[in-house]
């Protein structure tokens, strides 16, 4: 099946009568998930108890121990009937496993499933009991072993894996339906935008993971039921195992001329050849991974999303992600006139107070975070990669880079003068009022130790970065120097490239995606690393 489809759509519909399509669906979906947890957990416990009873009875019968009413000395029928009833009841409790497993074996187009091997083992063991009941002389407890116990144990392992999956989905849904804005990470699919934003990176086949704020993650339950990575191999092995079982049956029947031994060989191959942890082999790692992701507020719904995240080689981040609060510091103020220094601070803080840039903390900090001191800014305009233009008290105010000032023909100090003030990861911010330079601010960029460790881990994993920049001072040279990033592994988007990417990262009330996170760099990257 395609990655986006569950292996059995009908089963998914039974397990989840409602998809999470709006916040109003949360109570109903939560009830369905709680019910599923209760049913799968109860099934695993009941089938496990039945398996234990059958294994004990079978062992006692083989050793000649006194079984009381089930003693095989006089007749084997009471024991066989008891075993048959217990196994049939276990199979009935696991009816979805039986139905899905046998359907997957017969109809290859139905998709891959880990249910086939336990279903085959149960059918073969039931057949063994029925044949021994029909021909009691075929069954000798001292020489032949009933496979009902191992078959039920396989059903128990399968049910336990599904119970763990149910607990994982329920816990994930608690985070997904928390009623707060999150962010959804998804693979950028627009080929034109993809080429635009990755031009210049050394990655020949970029798979870009972008993130957008949202309130609801679409298709969460369907994603949670997606095909496991191991299902295809288990389905193929099930067909091979069935072939071996049939071969063992025919060989024993023809060579030993003993039908009882032949049916025991068939059941034995199917029971002992199947992995006990068929679903646990995927359920346990998924559970542990989700617990790790949940600690930093991330949710990866299912195996389809894990596979997709594993193919990602480019991440979209922002300057605020790379230079969190405290990493950018003010190193100097050079007003044109010394008496204008306070006004320069107020104008700069006013221009940056309501824009999404890491620089605003510096200027607001100089005012003591007292917004009452700020001036009203009208017609504020963001010029990507250049700076900001607005009007204060009827005067046009600009704050930004040298390129912004050159665009508006503002006279500036020489480039040689600027170079002397931009060494060691330092940059100059210009403030102009009414067409004239008003002040210069010197800021320094320092790497964040935690961010540096994360970026080093991403670099070693072969991931590159595109920086959707909200800081006009930020460029590739600064990032390569601050975080020791190789050339070709980081790209700062230009204004045109930012516009091309903007629709892909804009807020939507609901969005499809492969991972839900808190919107922070730690949650975004932490969830990706957990996957």
Residue ranges and their predicted role:
Residues 3-121, 128-237:
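Structural motif at membrane-water interfaces of alpha-helical integral membrane proteins
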Residues 86-97, 103, 148-177, 204-314, ...:
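Hydrophobic alpha-helical transmembrane segments
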Residues 101, 290, 321, 394, ...:
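Residue-level signature of catalytic and energy-coupling elements of molecular machines
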Residues 206-207, 392-394, 434-531:
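Conserved ATP-binding TGD loop and adjacent catalytic N/P-domain core of P-type ATPases
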Residues 221, 230-231, 334-384, 406-408, ...:
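ATP-binding catalytic core of ATPases
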Residues 305-332:
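Asp-based phosphoryl-transfer active-site loop
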Residues 316, 388-389, 427-433, 467-469:
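Cytosolic beta-strand hydrophobic patch enriched in CBS
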């Amino acid at each position: 099946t395609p990655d986006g489809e569950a292996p059995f759509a009908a089963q998914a519909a039974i397990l989840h009568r409602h998809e999470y399509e709006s916040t109003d669906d949360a109570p109903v979906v939560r009830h369905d998930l709680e019910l599923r947890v209760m049913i799968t957990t109860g099934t695993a416990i009941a089938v496990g108890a039945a398996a234990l009873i059958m294994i004990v009875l079978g062992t006692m019968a083989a050793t000649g121990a006194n079984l009381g009413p089930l003693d095989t000395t006089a007749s084997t029928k009471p024991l066989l009937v008891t075993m048959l009833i217990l196994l049939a009841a276990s199979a009935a409790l696991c009816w979805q496993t039986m139905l899905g497993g046998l359907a997957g074996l017969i109809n290859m187009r139905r998709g891959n499933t880990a249910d086939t091997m336990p279903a085959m083992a149960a059918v073969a063991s039931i057949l063994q009991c029925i044949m021994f009941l029909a021909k009691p002389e075929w069954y000798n407890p001292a020489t032949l072993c009933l496979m009902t116990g191992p078959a039920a144990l396989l059903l128990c392992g399968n049910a336990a894996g599904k119970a763990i999956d149910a607990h994982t989905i329920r816990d994930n849904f608690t985070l997904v339906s928390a009623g707060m804005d999150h962010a959804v990470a998804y693979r950028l699919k627009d080929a034109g935008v993809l080429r635009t934003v990755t031009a210049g990176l050394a990655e020949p086949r970029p798979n870009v993971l972008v993130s957008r704020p949202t309130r609801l993650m679409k298709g969460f339950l369907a994603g949670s039921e997606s095909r496991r990575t191991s299902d295809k191999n288990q389905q193929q092995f099930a067909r091979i195992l069935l072939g071996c079982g049939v071969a063992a049956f025919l060989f024993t029947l023809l060579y030993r001329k003993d039908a009882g031994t032949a049916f025991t060989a068939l059941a034995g191959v199917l029971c002992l050849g199947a992995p006990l942890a068929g679903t646990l082999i995927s359920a346990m790692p998924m559970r542990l991974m989700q617990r790790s992701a949940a600690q930093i507020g991330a949710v990866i719904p299912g195996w389809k999303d894990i596979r997709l995240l594993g193919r990602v080689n480019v991440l979209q981040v922002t300057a605020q992600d790379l230079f969190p609060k405290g990493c950018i510091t003010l190193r100097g103020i050079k007003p044109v006139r010394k008496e204008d220094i306070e006004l320069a601070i107020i104008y700069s803080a006013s221009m940056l107070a309501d824009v999404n840039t890491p620089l605003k903390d510096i200027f607001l900090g100089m005012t003591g975070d007292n917004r009452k001191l700020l001036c009203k800014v009208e017609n504020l305009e963001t010029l990507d990669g250049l700076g900001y233009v607005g009007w204060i008290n009827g005067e046009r105010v600009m704050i930004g880079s040298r390129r912004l000032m050159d665009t508006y023909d503002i006279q500036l100090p020489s480039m040689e003068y600027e170079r002397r003030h931009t060494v060691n990861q330092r940059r100059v911010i210009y403030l102009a009022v009414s067409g004239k330079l008003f002040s210069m601010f010197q800021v320094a960029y320092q790497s964040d130790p935690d961010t540096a460790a994360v970026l080093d881990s991403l670099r070693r994993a072969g991931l590159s970065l595109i920086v959707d920049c909200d800081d006009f001072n930020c460029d590739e040279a600064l990032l390569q120097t601050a975080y020791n990033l190789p050339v070709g592994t980081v790209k700062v988007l230009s204004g045109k490239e930012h516009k091309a990417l903007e629709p892909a990262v804009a807020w939507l009330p609901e969005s499809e995606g492969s991972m839900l996170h808190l919107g922070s760099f730690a949650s975004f990257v932490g969830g990706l690393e957990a996957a």
